[in-house]
Curated annotation (Swiss-Prot):
One of the primary rRNA binding proteins, it binds directly to 16S rRNA where it helps nucleate assembly of the platform of the 30S subunit by binding and bridging several RNA helices of the 16S rRNA. Forms an intersubunit bridge (bridge B4) with the 23S rRNA of the 50S subunit in the ribosome. The keyword rRNA-binding applies. The lineage of its organism: Bacteria, Pseudomonadati, Bacteroidota, Flavobacteriia, Flavobacteriales. Residues 1-13 have a biased composition (Basic and acidic residues). Belongs to the universal ribosomal protein uS15 family. GO terms for cellular component: cytosolic small ribosomal subunit. HAMAP family: Ribosomal_uS15_B (MF_01343_B). This is Small ribosomal subunit protein uS15. PROSITE patterns: RIBOSOMAL_S15. GO terms for molecular function: rRNA binding; structural constituent of ribosome. GO terms for biological process: translation. It comes from Christiangramia forsetii (strain DSM 17595 / CGMCC 1.15422 / KT0803) (Gramella forsetii). Part of the 30S ribosomal subunit. Forms a bridge to the 50S subunit in the 70S ribosome, contacting the 23S rRNA. Gene3D superfamilies: 6.10.250.3130, S15/NS1, RNA-binding.
């Protein structure tokens, strides 16, 4: 598996409030961003993998929903996570 529990803990500790903070919006956005990057690399070599392409679109939608929630709830945290992850607004 490409995403081990150690890697998840690293992502959550870097972007969340702690390594076990799996519920914060920032941690989930960072995890989705990592998964999106992995699926994008997979699709570069496997262009006809339509199931993965659909999964990628669904993940992008989930991340967008979380970003919208964070923007409405706390604009400072939203701007920080967008800058930290290098996402477009």
């Amino acid at each position: 598996m490409y995403l081990t529990s150690e890697k998840k803990e690293e992502i959550f500790s870097k972007h969340g409030k702690g390594k076990n903070d799996t519920g914060s919006a920032e941690g989930q956005i960072a995890l989705f961003t990592h998964r999106i990057a992995h699926l994008s690399e997979h699709l570069k070599t496997n262009r006809k993998d339509y199931n993965t392409e659909r999964s990628l679109v669904m993940l992008v939608g989930k991340r967008r929903s979380l970003l919208d929630y964070l923007m409405k709830k706390d604009i400072i945290r939203y701007r920080a996570i967008v800058k930290e992850l290098g996402l477009r607004k």
